[in-house]
């Protein structure tokens, strides 16, 4: 594209952007109205309790009662259209040109195939149903939370966007079908648990994923495929270049759609953290800013869970940090029955026991374990600090 053509295209894109922004402002007004009603439904002030530490049993009960009375249906169900079985293209395909190198993607591996789900697409759709795989890839732009779920709990049915928020977080619903005898259930994303329906209290199993910048994902997996910018829902690839929420993601911006009951001010509200919930209701958070202060790469050993907790999350873990990729990932430290200790050496993750080199994706690049992969802690995910500390109050905060 020449300079003249570029200027013309930029002017056209700017006009379209302003139109989209106006549409999105109207949309946000609906969400703000929804937030006001939802907060009123949750105004009893009872401290959240139970699994996850931030479930808010009394709050959720009140919200369910409001939903059943039809008082909070401000934003229609599926007003934000979830994607189902989108097309995927190679990184160099023209339908992938909506992505910049620094754009964030959720990467997963399925039977040796690598797939990328960009935030750019999920800003607008929030859920991507992968029906053949029985997975739902989800991202809530208001809590910055990336989570991938198995769908066995809902019989493989799809998830849709309910239009409700709980603690500013996406509330999904299961599309059980009009002829089903089963009542649909609401699923607050960061609870990963059913509410207000037949599947009340059912837990969703998470599928391991890696949130990372696009260029670094492609460098790790050049044969990856990515969600096509031509989704067939009236938005061409250029629309996916537009972040629709203005300065919402700025780290120090405390503005949220629903007012925060209280704010844990140990970190900036919109700082990204790698959070790992504890089974007993707590959690541990690794702030990206603190990780960045350690250096370009870091391998941090920790124990994710209570010492007396008989669960996978009480086992030792290691968090790999890559500043350039803006990626933090938690792994188990045992492979093939051997416990490993990691450090950064000569710009690479290395285990002391065998000298094998590992990538940020937990894959051994050289040494005795070449071709092997560490087990990701599937329950670990990236979110904004304010959100993780709302759902898991007073979490352990890792600092160097």
Indicate where each model-derived feature is located.
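Bacterial N-terminal signal peptides that target proteins for export
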Residues: 18-32
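Bacterial signal peptide processing site
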Residues: 43-45
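Mid-to-C-terminal functional-domain signal that highlights helix-capping/loop sites
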Residues: 47-400
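C-terminal motif of bacterial Sec signal peptides marking the signal peptidase cleavage site
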Residues: 39-41
């Amino acid at each position: 594209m020449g300079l003249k053509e570029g200027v013309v295209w930029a002017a056209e894109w700017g006009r379209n952007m302003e139109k989209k922004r106006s549409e999105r402002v109207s949309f946000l007004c609906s969400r703000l109205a929804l937030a006001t009603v939802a907060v009123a439904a949750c105004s009893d002030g009872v401290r959240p309790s139970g699994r996850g530490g931030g479930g808010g049993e009394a709050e959720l009960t009140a919200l369910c009662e409001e939903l059943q009375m039809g008082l909070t249906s401000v934003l229609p169900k599926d007003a934000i259209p979830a994607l189902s079985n989108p097309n995927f293209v190679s990184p160099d395909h023209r339908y992938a040109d909506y992505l910049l190198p620094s754009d964030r993607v959720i990467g997963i591996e399925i039977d040796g195939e690598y797939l990328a789900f960009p935030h750019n697409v999920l800003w607008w759709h929030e859920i991507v149903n992968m029906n053949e795989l029985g997975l739902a890839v989800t991202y809530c732009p208001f809590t910055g939370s990336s989570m991938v779920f198995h769908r066995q709990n809902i019989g493989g049915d799809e998830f849709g966007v309910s239009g409700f928020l709980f603690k500013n977080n996406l509330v999904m619903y299961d599309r059980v079908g009009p002829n089903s005898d089963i009542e649909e259930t609401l699923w607050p994303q960061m609870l990963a648990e059913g509410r207000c329906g037949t599947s009340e209290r059912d837990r969703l199993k998470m599928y391991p994923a890696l949130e990372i910048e696009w260029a670094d994902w492609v460098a790790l997996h050049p044969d990856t495929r990515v969600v096509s910018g031509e989704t067939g829902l009236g938005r061409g690839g250029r629309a996916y270049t537009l972040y629709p929420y203005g300065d919402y993601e700025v780290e120090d911006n405390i503005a949220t759609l629903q007012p925060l009951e209280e704010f844990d001010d140990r970190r900036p509200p919109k700082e990204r953290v790698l959070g790992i919930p504890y089974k007993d209701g707590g959690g541990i958070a690794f702030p990206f800013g603190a990780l960045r202060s350690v250096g370009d790469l870091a391998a941090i050993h920790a124990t994710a869970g209570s010492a007396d907790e008989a669960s996978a999350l009480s086992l030792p873990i290691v968090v790999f940090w890559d500043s350039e990729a803006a990626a933090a990932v938690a792994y188990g430290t045992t492979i093939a029955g051997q416990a490993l200790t990691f450090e950064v050496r000569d710009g690479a993750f290395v285990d002391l026991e065998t000298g094998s080199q590992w990538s940020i994706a937990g894959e051994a690049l050289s040494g005795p374990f070449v071709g092997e992969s560490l087990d990701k802690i599937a329950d670990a995910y990236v979110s904004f600090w304010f959100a993780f500390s709302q759902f898991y109050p007073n979490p352990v905060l890792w600092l160097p």
